[in-house]
């Protein structure tokens, strides 16, 4: 019944032109509530900021990514810096990606998205850990815990993007908003060298409103130029059917 209700709700959403959505707000202002569901199925991008306890969810509109909404992180654990060992209860930092098999609609923590730790960088440094998630229930032992209401919306948009053809959803996790002022404030940190590898990814998105293309070379993150064209185009919610939540 829930699946049927969701489908009917989407079909009843009034149609608006995509041009109208583009003109509705700037790239740093959240999309208005009446437009949100009409963007379901469009490509998305996630940024997490530990110090600010914020998860920003972006949706592709035209050639750039627009802030869909910001969500407060209930809890994360272990303080600033990358996760290094299984059992250190530390929440990861770095560049990750999510595919469909990493979605957990029946998680013991309501709903969950496995971020894909360890990635190539983590493995190159011998970092260990598993089951690192963005999930609900506001409980964290190394994950990013959201309210159930928050993870509901995040999960729907990530699922929609992947089902509709986005190969993977990038998740960039930063210790803080990596402005020059914040970098200076943390210049004596033991993680300074690591954070300087993350900053080009943050800066690239700030300048272009497009997710950075990141690789790992000789055990270091390297931000490179993205492909000139993306095959996935934004779609409206009326073209998309949500899977039934378990």
Swiss-Prot record:
Q: Name one Pfam family in it.
A: YkuD
SUPFAM superfamilies, A to Z:
L,D-transpeptidase catalytic domain-like (SSF141523)
Signal peptide from the UniProt entry: 1-19
| Residue intervals of the L,D-TPase catalytic domain | 44-174
Any single GO BP term: regulation of cell shape
Gene3D superfamilies the UniProt entry points to: L,D-transpeptidase catalytic domain-like (2.40.440.10)
Q: Under which pathway is this protein filed?
A: Cell wall biogenesis; peptidoglycan biosynthesis
Q: What is this protein identified as? A: Putative L,D-transpeptidase YafK
Naturally occurring in which organism (per UniProt): Escherichia coli (strain K12)
Name of the encoding gene: yafK
């Amino acid at each position: 019944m829930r699946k049927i209700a969701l489908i009917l709700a989407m079909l009843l959403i009034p149609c608006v032109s995509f041009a109208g959505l583009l003109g509705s707000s700037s790239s740093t202002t959240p999309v208005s509530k009446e437009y949100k569901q009409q963007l379901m199925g469009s490509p998305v991008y996630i940024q997490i900021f530990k110090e600010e306890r914020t998860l920003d969810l972006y949706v592709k509109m035209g050639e750039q990514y627009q802030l869909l909404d910001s969500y407060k992180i209930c809890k994360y654990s272990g303080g600033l810096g990358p996760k290094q060992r299984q059992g250190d209860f530390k929440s990861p930092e770095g560049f990750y990606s999510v595919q469909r098999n990493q979605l957990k609609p029946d998680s013991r923590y309501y709903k969950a998205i496995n971020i894909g730790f360890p990635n190539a960088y983590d493995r190159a440094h011998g970092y260990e850990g598993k089951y690192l998630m963005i999930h609900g229930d506001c409980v964290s032992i190394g994950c990013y815990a959201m309210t159930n209401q928050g993870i509901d919306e995040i999960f729907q948009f990530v699922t929609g993007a992947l089902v509709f053809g986005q190969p993977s959803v990038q998740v960039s996790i930063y210790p803080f908003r990596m402005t020059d002022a914040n970098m200076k404030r943390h210049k004596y940190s033991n993680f300074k060298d690591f954070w300087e590898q993350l900053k080009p990814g943050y800066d690239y998105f700030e300048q272009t409103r497009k997710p950075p293309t990141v690789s790992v070379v000789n055990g270091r993150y390297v931000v490179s130029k993205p492909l000139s064209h993306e095959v996935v185009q934004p779609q409206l919610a009326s073209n998309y059917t949500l899977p039934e939540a378990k």
